[in-house]
């Protein structure tokens, strides 16, 4: 049987070889954390390489994702479907081993990491999901949800502000199944971190309410093992502070930034292997090392034991077991489609002129009763975002059976935590803040789009309609920024019906995030036929039309739709042939077939005006260079909303005059 050190050296060898073959990458962190990884993966991690989707597996996250050869080596050695050829293709086009770990490529990669700090934050979300799912489904004698979340993170993760947001909340909520390892190697790209990172990290985490295990030798297997055992036994989240040597084993580069982000070079690799006693060539792993690492048999036994436990649970609680399966499979309730469509039809039949943020809350009230998988929240703005409904129950450290998270003023942390909740499974997470403060969270929403995970964001107070709070709180360019993000679905509804449709589609969308943008001010409900209600889902549809071919098309979203309707009525009375298109979602419209898009926007009709209280430039795509845009070209001002709309040209008079100029 190979020694622990010999098995850990397999990680070091593969990491050196992979980075050298790619001629780029980060060998230092994998070499430094290899001993920790060997103890965790071989003695503690419950997983099954033959079924990476096993619901009750432990989750492992490499938050310092630049050290990706570490996780690729672990997955390969443990027996996942990741071959030695895949490792040789590290960082190559269309490989399963991209430069940073990406969800959906290599089996066993739980989340995409690389932007530092987001991995630990995803881990907080996964641990929250585990604790909530356990509270909702476990019954006496039947702990079917019972797994840990393990996170490796480096100095960079801890320097990023998001780590404070997430780890603070993790301590407050008592996430005892979360165990993080700090790779305390004292090195970052610029050199020794003591010049820019001198925090007392153990005291920092003690202040959060974490269980802290300081000064663990990251190259002493017995010390690492004892620390993990202590962490698993403590009811608080745990930070294991492991002192490591970056690039461990490299005679000339270990302990320096020279081994952080570049290949070691052929000579140094040879010297390192000699020093480690590793007598094998590039990508050469001997049979005894593979045998020592192989987790397939043990993993299958662990899953089989859990399956037997679940069968007993299903016999005792058949309805709960069926509901658990539905939830973790991500299936909607059987009656969902029919009931949701009825709710939308009823809203159209019973008009209400309300703010779309209130319409959003009403949609939550209607849909929430059918969706126990909802896990809502807000970044300390629930009374403004209107994200709580009658069925909302807040999560508390001692009671996680609820469905609502008070994230505090942590927009970035909230959004990345939601990514972790979505990745874990069993929940449909939604969160909220003012649209302006989407900026704090932008990269986490980009990560949701990149990973194709369901993350529903409610962004309220969507324009200069916010009024007196002024330009610091008035969004201008934010909607365009969201629309320009690949795989982001963005909706800005004009009334309660469009709001409910947007919510329905966001709930049904499993392959990416949704941004639902709502107003502070009341909006007039529009009249629609049944066919028009059905067409809302297409992203843009003809709301008001003329006889025959229009000479002018007015395009509007959200609060500006009623402005377009009023202007069209006045122009029609003056003999103009005008069409009004409500366009709540440009990305949904862009996915429609050419026939539908041509029917809404005939190419022969070039006189077009877009009206939106957001950045104007975005709309040239739809109006063309010959069209006009009534939008924002500057930041807002502090004043009552009515005065601002008038000042910036969002009036019936200005729309009519602009139309006449265009038609002249």
Swiss-Prot record:
- What InterPro entries does the annotation carry? THDP-binding, Transketo_C/PFOR_II, Transketolase-like_C_2, Transketolase-like_Pyr-bd, Transketolase_bac-like, Transketolase_BS, Transketolase_CS, Transketolase_fam
What are its cofactors?
Answer: Mg(2+); Ca(2+); Mn(2+); Co(2+)
Keywords linked to the UniProt accession: Calcium, Magnesium, Metal-binding, Thiamine pyrophosphate, Transferase
Where is the site described as Important for catalytic activity found in this chain?
A: 26, 260
Q: Which residues form the active site?
A: 411 (proton donor)
Q: Which GO terms describe its biological process?
A: pentose-phosphate shunt
In short, the EC number is 2.2.1.1
Query: Which cellular component, as a GO term, is one annotated location?
Result: cytosol
UniProt-listed PROSITE patterns: TRANSKETOLASE_1, TRANSKETOLASE_2
Under Gene Ontology molecular function, one entry of this record is: metal ion binding
Write down the chemical reaction(s) this protein catalyses.
D-sedoheptulose 7-phosphate + D-glyceraldehyde 3-phosphate = aldehydo-D-ribose 5-phosphate + D-xylulose 5-phosphate
Binding annotation for substrate: 26, 260, 357, 384, 461, 469, 520
The residues the record assigns to binding Mg(2+) are 155, 185, 187
Q: Which residues bind thiamine diphosphate?
A: 66, 114-116, 156, 185, 260, 437
What does the entry comment about cofactor binding? Binds 1 Mg(2+) ion per subunit. Can also utilize other divalent metal cations, such as Ca(2+), Mn(2+) and Co(2+).
Please name the Gene3D superfamilies in this protein's record.
Answer: 3.40.50.920, 3.40.50.970
Purpose of the protein: Catalyzes the transfer of a two-carbon ketol group from a ketose donor to an aldose acceptor, via a covalent intermediate with the cofactor thiamine pyrophosphate.
Q: Which NCBIfam families match?
A: tktlase_bact
Checking PANTHER family in the record gives: TRANSKETOLASE, TRANSKETOLASE 1-RELATED
- According to its UniProt record, which protein family does this protein belong to? Belongs to the transketolase family.
The entry describes its oligomerization and partners as: Homodimer.
Q: What name appears for this protein in its UniProt entry?
A: Transketolase 1
Source species of the chain: Aliivibrio fischeri (strain ATCC 700601 / ES114)
């Amino acid at each position: 049987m190979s020694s622990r050190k010999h098995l850990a050296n397999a990680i070091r060898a593969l990491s050196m070889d992979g980075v050298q073959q790619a001629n780029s990458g980060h060998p230092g962190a994998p070499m430094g954390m290899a001993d920790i990884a060997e103890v965790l993966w071989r003695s503690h991690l419950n997983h099954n390489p033959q079924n990476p989707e096993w619901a009750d597996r432990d989750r492992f996250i490499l938050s310092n994702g630049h050290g990706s050869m570490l996780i690729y080596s672990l997955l390969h050695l443990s027996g996942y479907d990741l071959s030695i050829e895949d490792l040789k293709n590290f960082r190559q086009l269309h490989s399963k081993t991209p430069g940073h770990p990406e969800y959906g490529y290599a089996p066993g990669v739980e989340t995409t990491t690389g932007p530092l700090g987001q991995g630990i934050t995803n881990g907080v979300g996964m641990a929250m999901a585990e604790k909530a799912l356990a509270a909702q489904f476990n019954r006496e004698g039947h702990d079917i949800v019972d797994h840990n979340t393990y996170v490796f993170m480096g100095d960079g993760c801890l320097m990023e502000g998001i780590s404070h947001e997430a780890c603070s909340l993790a301590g407050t909520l008592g996430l005892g199944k979360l165990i993080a390892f700090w790779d305390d190697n004292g090195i970052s790209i610029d050199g020794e971190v003591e010049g820019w990172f001198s925090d007392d990290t153990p005291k920092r985490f003690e202040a959060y309410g974490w269980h802290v295990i300081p000064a663990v030798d990251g190259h002493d297997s017995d010390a690492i093992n004892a620390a993990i055992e202590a962490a698993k036994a403590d009811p608080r989240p745990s930070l294991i502070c492991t002192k490591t040597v970056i690039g461990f084993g490299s005679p000339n580069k270990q302990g320096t930034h020279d081994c952080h982000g570049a290949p070691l070079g052929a000579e140094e690799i040879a010297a390192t292997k000699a020093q480690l006693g590793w007598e094998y060539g590039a990508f050469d792993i001997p049979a005894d090392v593979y045998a020592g690492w192989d987790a397939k048999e043990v993993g299958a036994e662990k899953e089989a034991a859990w399956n037997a436990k679940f069968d007993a649970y299903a016999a005792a609680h058949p309805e709960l077991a069926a509901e658990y399966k539905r939830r973790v499979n991500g299936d909607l309730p059987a009656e969902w489609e029919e009931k949701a469509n009825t709710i939308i039809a009823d809203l159209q039949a019973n008009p209400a002129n309300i703010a779309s943020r209130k319409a959003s809350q009403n949609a939550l009230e209607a849909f929430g009763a059918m969706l126990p998988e909802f896990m809502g929240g807000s970044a300390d703005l629930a009374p403004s975002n209107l994200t709580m409904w009658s069925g909302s129950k807040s999560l508390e450290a001692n009671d996680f059976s609820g469905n609502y998270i008070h994230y505090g003023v942590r927009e970035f942390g909230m959004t990345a935590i939601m990514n972790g909740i979505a990745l874990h499974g069993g929940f449909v997470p939604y969160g909220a803040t003012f649209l302006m403060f989407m900026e704090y969270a932008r990269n986490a929403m980009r990560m949701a789009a990149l990973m194709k995970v369901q993350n529903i964001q409610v962004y309220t107070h969507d324009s200069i309609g916010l009024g007196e709070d002024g330009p610091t709180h008035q969004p201008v360019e934010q909607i365009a920024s969201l629309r320009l993000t690949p795989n982001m679905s963005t909706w800005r509804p004009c009334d309660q019906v469009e709001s409910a449709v947007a919510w329905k589609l966001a709930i049904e969308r499993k392959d990416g995030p949704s941004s639902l943008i709502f107003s502070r001010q009341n909006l007039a409900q529009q009249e629609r036929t049944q066919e028009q209600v059905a067409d809302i889902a297409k992203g843009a549809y003809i709301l008001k039309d003329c006889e025959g071919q229009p000479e002018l098309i007015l395009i509007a979203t959200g609060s500006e739709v009623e402005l377009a309707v009023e202007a069209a009525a006045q122009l029609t009375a003056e003999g103009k042939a005008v069409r009004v298109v409500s366009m709540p979602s440009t990305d949904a419209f862009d996915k429609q077939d050419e026939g539908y898009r041509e029917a809404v926007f005939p190419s022969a009709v070039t006189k077009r005006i877009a009206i939106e209280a957001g950045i104007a430039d975005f709309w040239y795509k739809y109006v063309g260079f010959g069209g006009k845009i009534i939008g924002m070209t500057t930041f807002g001002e502090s004043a009552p909303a009515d005065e601002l709309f008038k000042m910036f040209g969002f009036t019936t008079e200005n729309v009519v005059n602009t139309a006449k100029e265009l038609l002249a």
